[in-house]
A protein has these predicted regions:
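Sec-dependent N-terminal signal peptides of Gram-positive bacterial secreted proteins and lipoproteins
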Residues: 2-26
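Acidic, metal/ion-coordinating pockets
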Residues: 22-37, 41-43, 47, 51, ...
Length: 390
């Protein structure tokens, strides 16, 4: 029994000795610093700064994956639609800027020019503001500008000195019709001189085979002119309209036609005017009767059968001095014609009632109403005649 106790004691003693040794060994291992592995060498992936250049500052927040603010989305700006374009064309009647050489009486056209001191602006002073504020003014040139002396064999032969062209220029007139029964009053020489004079003055002309083009506000206007004594010219009219139709936004056709002193159009006028519209014309201007006639609105387009006289040097005191300016306003939207509207401006060929002073003047009040009523009366007899709402 004693041997087991001793043996146990010896075993316990041995165990204690072993544990004490282990404890010391473990403490040694903890206190001893562990050698660090050498850090791996990383390759430089950023270019070295150029000599003399400061390296860029690094953003301390680089790589921060915090919330990103979204940039506000700008609403698309709606473009304003282009404004409509309104083209105003003024049409007026017979302008005899000169006289017959046999008219040597007091108050002939040349005599009046002398009395006003050669002032070119005098003759159209009463309507200049109207012509200044339109896009195009077109009148019938019922004369020649020439110094020729050889005349046609006829009763009245009109001419004016070539310098008289300044009257048209100072009147703010851009274009004239030359197809009429007086353009050859001084034969071929007179005709050639007239065209040369107009060219030198920068005035456009249409008729007798010539076509005129004029542009305003990006809109092109074409003008044609004819002596319309019969309907034999229909093929030529149609061909010419088709030719210029592809080049112009507005086509104007002038006819010198009808019977003098008659206030109603004849059958030729009615047929030719409506034919021109059917062929593609946008407005028809008529002259020759020397008095006013009615107006058709045919298929939405105007036929002015006679504008009457205007600045008329062919008579020092005609009994009927009534006339008018017809303005046709064309409205375009995105290059397309969307409306055609007519305006009648009643006038007198003279600023005086007792004599022709060759100064067309706008009428007012009762006189303007009287002329307007005449036009409406003559129009009422037409199949497509206008009313008060032209």
């Amino acid at each position: 029994m004693r041997r087991y106790i001793v043996s146990i004691a010896m075993v316990l003693c041995f165990c204690l000795t072993f544990l004490t040794s282990c404890s010391y060994f473990m403490e040694d291992k903890i206190d001893e610093p562990r050698p660090k592995d050498p850090a791996p060498i990383q390759e430089d992936t950023i270019d070295s700064p150029i000599e003399g250049e400061e390296p860029e500052d690094r953003d301390d927040n680089e790589g921060d994956m915090g919330p990103v603010e979204e940039e506000p989305v700008e609403e698309p700006i709606e473009e304003e639609p282009p404004e409509d374009i309104v083209i105003t064309i003024s049409l007026a009647g017979d302008c005899t800027i000169g006289t017959d050489e046999t008219f040597t009486y007091t108050n002939s056209f040349p005599d009046r020019l002398n009395k006003v001191g050669g002032d070119w602006k005098y003759f159209f002073a009463g309507v200049r503001d109207i012509f200044d504020n339109d896009d195009l003014t077109l009148v019938n040139l019922e004369t020649t500008f020439t110094k020729a002396t050889k005349k046609a064999n006829k009763r009245f032969r009109f001419k004016g000195d070539p310098s008289y062209v300044n009257i048209l220029k100072e009147g703010s007139i851009e274009m004239v019709n030359i197809s009429n029964n007086h353009i050859y009053d001084y034969l071929q020489q007179g005709f050639d001189d007239t065209l040369e004079t107009l060219d030198n003055a920068g005035l456009l002309y249409s008729g007798e085979g010539y076509k005129a083009f004029y542009e305003s506000q990006g809109i092109t206007m074409a003008s044609l002119g004819y002596q319309g004594w019969n309907t034999d010219i229909k093929d030529q009219v149609k061909s010419d309209i088709e030719e210029v139709r592809d080049q112009a936004d507005i086509v104007i056709v002038s006819f010198h036609w009808g019977i003098e002193t008659k206030n109603y159009p004849n059958d030729v006028q009615l047929e030719l005017g409506r034919f021109a519209i059917d062929a593609g014309a946008d407005v028809v201007a008529g002259h020759h009767p020397h008095v006013i006639q009615g107006i058709d609105k045919y298929n939405g387009k105007y036929i002015v059968y006679s504008l009457g006289n205007f600045c008329f040097g062919g008579n020092r005191n005609p009994k009927d001095k009534d006339t008018f300016i017809f303005q046709n306003q064309f409205t375009f939207s995105d290059g397309e014609l969307i409306d055609s509207h007519g305006i009648i401006i009643p006038c007198s060929i003279s600023s005086r009632k007792d004599v022709n002073d060759y100064q067309p003047t706008v009428l007012e009040g009762e006189e303007a109403e009287r002329v307007m009523n005449r036009i409406l009366k003559y129009s009422s007899s037409l199949k497509y005649g206008i009313g008060n709402d032209t």
